[in-house]
Amino acid sequence: QGMRRLTGFDAIADEEGFIVAYPQGIRRGWNSGPGGTPDDVAFLEALAAQLQARYAIDPDRIYATGLSAGGMMSQWLACESELLAAIAPVAGTLPTPSADACARTRPVPALFIHGTEDSIVPFGGGNAGPADGFRPAEENARLWAAANGCGTAFEVEQLEEAAPDDGTTATRITYAGCPDAGAVHFYRIDGGGHTWP
């Protein structure tokens, strides 16, 4: 129920005509890395197959997003499965062992969002508790862009403030030279914490 309330996706799905699902990992977490249990990649693939059998879902238009561990899981699912058309992780960079083990065989478009003041999954990387070290947020996006076949150049754009009183600003970084099916955007939320934008 938390992500349903936080994202407001139900209303957007009704308005735009798409189906949204809110899977929940065991103990509010996900196995977003090599080995271990449960096999959350298999779980999410099975969930997608069940939804496709029940509803008219275009198999080429399945997307994943998530906050924190959910954002990490969206990336790991794209690393391990051909299921997704694109991802949009929020405040969730892959732990270094997962990033090193990512074996994507095709470009997967991505839109990353991360706050510079995130104290749970630090923007600058490193550790924030018992988890393995996280890659810095901008490096995580850059490495994804490189794996997609994008060039090293990027465009930086300061965005208009949607909520001038919230103490944050947003900057969009768009990687250049990406293949048509491999665009990568990174939204840096200056002053933003570990939260949904």
Predicted region positions:
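Short beta-strand/loop motif that positions the catalytic acidic residue
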Residues: 112-114, 118
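Short, proline-enriched alpha-helix->beta-strand connector loops that line the catalytic pocket
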Residues: 105-110, 179-184
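Acidic catalytic loop of the alpha/beta-hydrolase fold
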Residues: 118-121, 194-196
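A conserved short beta-strand
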Residues: 83-93, 108-109
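Serine-hydrolase catalytic machinery in alpha/beta-hydrolase-like enzymes
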Residues: 1-63, 67, 72-76, 80, ...
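Alpha-helical scaffolding within the catalytic cores
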Residues: 4-10, 93-103, 166-175
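Acidic, glycine-rich loop-and-strand cores that form catalytic or ligand-binding grooves
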Residues: 133-169
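Conserved hydrolase catalytic core segment
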Residues: 76-85, 95-99
